[in-house]
Amino acid sequence: MSNLYTIDAKLFEPAAIDAETAAFNERIEKELSVAPPLYRFEPQVIRDARAAGYSVFGPVKHLDQARSRFVPGPGGDIPVRVFIPPKVAGVYMHIHGGGFMLGGADQQDEFLAEICKACQVVVVSAGYRLAPENPYPAAPDDCEAVALWLAKNSRREFGTERLVIGGESAGANLSVATLLRMRKRHGFRGFRAAVLTYGGYDMSMTPSVRRWGERYLILNTKIIEWFHENYVQGANVFDPDISPLYADLSGMPPALFSIGTLDPLMDDSLFMHARWLAAGNRSELAVYPGGIHVFNFFPIKLAQKANTRINDFIIGAVSDNL
């Protein structure tokens, strides 16, 4: 594990990958080798299949403890999934992944329920309009609306103003975009930390994405290009609202960047961690040998390690000592 400022080169060596992770990766790659790549399907076909449990993620489980609500947004009501612990230490605004095209606020109940329980935080998972039907800026517009709702209402709704924001993959991108919008448009700096897990922060594509090629480990270069094209649809990929790697990152909250070494988006986290620090912010980088994209959603020890680190970071962010 790296500390705040240095990266151990040994983490990137094949020998650093434990046997369980290697076997898991081999199984996933074998399963996907006989599956057509995502870009051969219409997005709604993929969404329906995933909702029915036909994916490497298995069945979608909805928990009784979760509550579905709606927050007013620029394109209509925005669905949010809410988990409330017995004692509230803070609020975690979660933004789901899915390449800006897939996923939903209600598709990771077990994952979010564990964060709620372990960290004693209310979890508010934001749904947002999906591309290509709703390209940029629909997704960040919706996430901004949920963040603004929390900024105005979290004390009345949940008894606290201790806010943390975060997400995975596209959700990490949208988390940073939301922080930047809240600072620029509303003068709001109330998020105490950002949990940024294997995000993609450069729609022009970092070297690790460009060089990855066809190897199909959840993502590959062409799938990422497909996601980007459907989301951006002709907008400027260097716009910091789309590619926050190019943003003025001054005044951002402490962040935890988590990335696996077998994720095409690895450089995005390495670069963003460096830029976060260079802007004068606190940043931690957690590098996981052999971790593939979305590895922390699967029942392996590497996932437990990553999720424990994330939970500890959230606990620290909402503590009285911050």
What are these regions (language model features)?
Residues 89-98:
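Short beta-strand element of the alpha/beta-hydrolase
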Residues 106-126:
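Short amphipathic alpha-helix adjacent to the substrate-entry channel of hydrolases
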Residues 134-154, 310:
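Alpha/beta-hydrolase active-site loop
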